[in-house]
Every structure is written in structure tokens, then in C-alpha cells.
Amino acid sequence: MMPIFSNRGKKKIVLPLLQYVYEQLYSMNFRDYCFVVGREKRSIEDHFAPHETYLRDLEGNYKKTMKQFYEKLDKSHLVWINQNKPLGFGDAVKRSERYVVTEDFIVHAGDVTILSKNRHPVLRLMDVAENNPDVKAILLCKKVKDLKRYGVPTIKKLSKDLFSVQEVIEKPDKPKSEFGILPLYYFKSEIFSSLKKIKLGKGKEF
């Protein structure tokens, strides 16, 4: 629920980052959402539950923004899943299996926002999936300086902007490429069988 400044009307207003991410995805016609959350679940779930009394007490641009947010929520289907222990991103994805079943799906960490001057990265991932139907997982990568903060892929170049991933090492001491993986993914449901095979990694996380 970290804040982000958003220009709505003539004034800047502060929105929770997760709301901004949700509204980005909503603008791309996503309507089904599965939130995997830990201890802070209550504040997140409360924010995503329309509250008419709260709305009546608001004023100006913020009231208009929240009213539009609630209208979007009313047209969305939200599911909440608990992650009782902080076992990492892989564990969070694995917990969504009963909701996803056999569908292709997007995973967004929700604690960062990814901006683009051109086509949004989510849509670019979907483009790659449509053009490569046999690919089971698509990752978004970027050249970064501090590679020890990222998952780092070993890659083989296929085209200007497309690479085949051979392996991924989380926060490596000796990185094998100059790319870090950003927290935005496109998966087919086969990812769940792969997640069940991996063991705890660095920091005792999946």
C-alpha cells in the first residue's frame, strides 16, 4: 500500500501504489484479479472494498477519483488468498493455482509500477505469447546496474528484443548476464508443476 503521486485534474493526489497498478490493468480490460497477501491483508482488502460512508466524507478530486475506483471495483471480480509465511514470490504464485486452474495469466508484484512511453509491457508480454503459443513463461527484463538485487537470467538472443531463458539465478554473487528480471510475468498454467519441483532458495524463499 505504498503511496504514489497521480495527476488527476489540476492537483496531484496520493494513491496507494497497488490501486494504481490495479487501474493500469483495468484499463487493459482485465476484470478478474487474485490477490495473494500476507500480514497486511486487512488494510489492502479494506481499501479494495467500496465504502459509501467514507466516500461521502471526501471532497474534490480525491472524491471523484475514489468514486471512479469504486465503480471499477464493482465491475471486477476479486479473490483474496493468504500467504501465511513469507516464502517468496514463487510460493505466492503457487497459491493461486486453484483460482487460475488452466488459464494463462499475468503476475504483477504490485509493489512497483512499470511505465512505458510506447506499448505497455503487459500488452507486450501478451503480444509475445500470442506470437509464440508454445512458450510457457515470458519474463520482462531490463539492463540494470545492481544485479545482486534481482533475479538474473542466462539468455540466448533470438531477435532484437526477444531472448530465450536458459536458467535464472536469484540475487547471484556472480551474474551471468547484465539483465535483471522485473516483477511482471506471463505464465501458462504449466508453471505450477514447475514450481512444485523447486527447492527453497536464498533467504529460504521459493
Predicted regions and their residues:
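Alpha-helix N-cap/helix-start and coil->helix boundary motif
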Residues: K41-R42, P86, R119, K188, ...
